[in-house]
Structures are given as C-alpha cells and as structure tokens.
Amino acid sequence: MKEINYAEVLVVLTNVDHYQGTTDLTGLWLGEAAEFVDEMTQAGIEVDYVSPQGGFVPLDPRSMKYADSAILKIYESADFKKRALTASLAPQDVNPADYSAIYYTGGHGVMWDFQIILNFRK
C-alpha cells in the first residue's frame, strides 16, 4: 500500500485530441498544467498526473502560442513529458485519498472528459 504523502497533489489532464464532431485539434492547454506544476514544484510539493484513459495526453496546439519561458521549462522537462504527456496514470491506478488536493486543469479538451473526471469525487 502506498504511504500517504499529504504534500502530494493529483493533476487531472485530458485525453481528448479534437473538438467533438470536428477535425479541429484540441487537448490540454499547456499553461493550465505547467503553471500549476511550476508553483507546486517551487513549494516543494510533488505531483502525479492522471487522465480519464491514462497514457497519452494531447496538447492543444493553440496553447503553444502563449507559452512563456516558465511554461516551456516545465514542458521541456523529462519528468513532465513522461509522466504527464506520455504515460499519465489511469483513474483505476490512483486512490484520490492518497492526495492532499486534486487539481483539474482547464482547456477545451476537458469539456468532453469531465463526466469521467468527476468520478474522482466519488
């Protein structure tokens, strides 16, 4: 059983890669995750990443236009690329009670994921 670390936060991401009913791309708004992760890291708080399906998390290509140096620093880190964007945890792999907080990222992709994501509250 995992030891509870009350200084650990679960970051909820999206798996949706296009607007429903269209071919227009969407996904995680990078700043929604990266700015939060940067703040947590600076405070010495660890984060884990989960998405409704686990695995790959697409980025909204429009979000890259607004990425500043702090956002890019997180984006370019090996840890973020692996644990957030490539191999996010699936809901069945986490116990929300193990976390002191759950942070739900914003962006357009989560509009279609939210029904699945809301199950974390149960």
What are these regions (language model features)?
Residues 1-122:
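Extended, subdomain-level signal for the structured scaffold at the beginning of enzyme domains
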